[in-house]
């Protein structure tokens, strides 16, 4: 019996490279953004294909995955590429500055989520979607499978208890990928600024 192979969004270059033509690109990713059987990071693949990556956004754990869970991550520069990294998990407001938003035209989001409400990656994605909506930037989710997509379980969040580890009125195990969540966030007008982010 043949095994089906999952092709993650980042590996579908012919479908999204045309959307990046003549654009400055920001990448929201971390150590989970691997392609080609885990041999290469999405950032390296983008640069190898001539994409003009001018900014990196990092979630919890930092861009290279070297920060402990819950640790505040500082802004930095990627040692391998020299590209500036803006932390969206720094213990402060964590919203990107206007100067950072001026560095690019389109955002790529490539994170491996685990499909539970208390994981912070979707909260970070939503924060950046909101900034993109307010500044008129395009937002492209390079989607990855939800490893527990077959499971929807637990109570829906009481929004009076909203926090950085629970920001949407969805069940504990919500059954969605980050791309599907992004569509739902837009469709339900859940962005804090009550605007709609131009997503792909």
What role is predicted for each listed range?
Residues 50-51, 132-138:
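A short helix->loop->beta-strand "cap" motif at the edges of active sites that frequently abuts
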Residues 73-104, 116:
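Glycine-rich oxoanion-binding loops at beta->alpha junctions
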Residues 113-125:
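Glycine/threonine-rich flexible loop motifs
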